[in-house]
């Protein structure tokens, strides 16, 4: 929105700064961060008053989790609000990719909010039926995939870009739409499964968001894409604003979510942020790279799938408990140990994902 002030610039005043993407990205980061610091405590106090007993704790979970009873959930509202406000302030609102990612984020956030609300109201761990959440998520993802395909340049429409290969594209035809739907919905559910320990999900989300923001900036810059041999998607550089706001809002939330957490992000946050990551990957044509950068989320999701399928087939379990972070808890790892080690893994995977820009 503030980009419109460049119309009043004579080229030598402060309004001219708004032309620069990097300046607006930095401003978006600090806007979201300050928003989180300012409104975090009032929101937590409000949620605690309204929710009473807070987020229900699984009876079959690690016994250490019972100490977290009474902690309010829906803290994702803080991240989501900071992200939306900051993006609307600093991004160019005539950019279709900004709106695609922003609307996907808000839509998945609303699904998560409904789920969190149902859990708190019923005081059990079952909120909105999984099938309902899944079908609504598919509808949102389908609309986003079609909008992204419509916005992409003609030579990239319905194409799948392959990392590590220069200018390698696979024409998926209209199969691109269901593929993109799987990317967005899959990302949403994978991050949701990861959000089981204090600070576990938010830092990997911020790391992935930073990585995808850099990729969006590169992919949207003709000179950089020409140098690196990466496909050029005009306009995606503006998603750096969104990614910067995501990281700023995430840090503001982590201030209150650091162990022992004063608030949980809940599905409100995990579904919103993960939907955003999937949407950015689809817009920038880096869907496969998302699987690398978000490898931790993929591992968490696979651990659940393997556990369920193996148990149905044999009546036995592969892991002591799924998702896999609970397996390590059952083995006696301390919660901070699991969280920090998973953060390190996320950082390594992010660096591998970034390397795909050059290794071609």
Swiss-Prot record:
Swiss-Prot/TrEMBL catalytic activity: UDP-N-acetyl-alpha-D-muramoyl-L-alanyl-gamma-D-glutamyl-meso-2,6-diaminopimeloyl-D-alanyl-D-alanine + di-trans,octa-cis-undecaprenyl phosphate = di-trans,octa-cis-undecaprenyl diphospho-N-acetyl-alpha-D-muramoyl-L-alanyl-D-glutamyl-meso-2,6-diaminopimeloyl-D-alanyl-D-alanine + UMP
UniProt superkingdom: Bacteria
Transmembrane segments: 27-47, 71-91, 93-113, 134-154, 168-188, 199-219, 239-259, 262-282, 288-308, 337-357
GO cellular component term, pick one: plasma membrane
EC identifiers of the protein: 2.7.8.13
Family, per entry: Belongs to the glycosyltransferase 4 family. MraY subfamily.
PANTHER family cross-referenced by the UniProt entry: PHOSPHO-N-ACETYLMURAMOYL-PENTAPEPTIDE-TRANSFERASE, PHOSPHO-N-ACETYLMURAMOYL-PENTAPEPTIDE-TRANSFERASE HOMOLOG
NCBIfam families per record: mraY
Protein name as annotated: Phospho-N-acetylmuramoyl-pentapeptide-transferase
Species, as recorded: Cereibacter sphaeroides (strain KD131 / KCTC 12085) (Rhodobacter sphaeroides)
Taxonomic lineage of the native organism: Bacteria, Pseudomonadati, Pseudomonadota, Alphaproteobacteria, Rhodobacterales
Gene from which this protein is expressed: mraY
């Amino acid at each position: 929105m503030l980009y419109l002030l460049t119309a009043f610039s004579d080229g030598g005043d402060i309004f001219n700064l708004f032309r620069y993407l990097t300046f607006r990205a930095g401003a978006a980061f600090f806007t979201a961060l300050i928003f989180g610091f300012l409104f975090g405590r009032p929101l937590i106090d409000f949620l605690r008053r309204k929710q009473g007993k807070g987020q229900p704790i699984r009876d079959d979970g690690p016994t250490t989790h019972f100490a977290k009873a009474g902690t309010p959930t829906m803290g994702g509202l803080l991240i989501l609000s900071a992200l939306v406000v900051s993006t609307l302030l600093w991004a160019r609102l005539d950019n279709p990719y900004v709106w695609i990612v922003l609307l996907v984020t808000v839509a998945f956030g609303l699904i998560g909010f409904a789920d969190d609300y149902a859990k708190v109201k019923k005081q059990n761990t079952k909120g909105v039926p999984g099938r309902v959440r899944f079908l609504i998520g598919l509808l949102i993802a389908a609309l986003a995939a079609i909008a992204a395909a419509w916005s992409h340049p003609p030579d990239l429409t319905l194409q799948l870009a392959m990392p590590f290969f220069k200018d390698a594209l696979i024409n998926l035809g209209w199969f691109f739409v269901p593929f993109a739907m799987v990317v967005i919905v899959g990302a949403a559910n994978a991050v949701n499964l990861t959000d089981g320990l204090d600070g576990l999900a938010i830092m990997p989300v911020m790391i992935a968001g930073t990585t995808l923001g850099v990729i969006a900036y590169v992919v949207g810059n003709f000179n950089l894409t020409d140098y690196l041999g990466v496909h050029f998607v005009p306009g995606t550089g503006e998603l750096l604003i969104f990614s910067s706001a995501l990281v700023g809002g995430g840090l503001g939330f982590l201030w209150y979510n650091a162990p022992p957490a004063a608030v949980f992000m809940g599905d409100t946050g995990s579904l919103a942020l993960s939907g955003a990551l999937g949407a950015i990957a689809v817009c920038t044509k880096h869907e496969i790279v998302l699987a690398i950068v978000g490898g931790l989320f993929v591992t968490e999701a696979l651990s659940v799938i393997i556990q369920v399928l193996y148990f149905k087939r044999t009546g036995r379990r592969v892991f002591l408990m799924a998702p896999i972070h609970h397996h390590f808890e059952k083995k006696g790892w301390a919660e901070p140990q699991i969280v920090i080690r998973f953060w390190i893994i996320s950082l390594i995977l992010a660096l591998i994902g970034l390397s795909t820009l050059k290794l071609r």
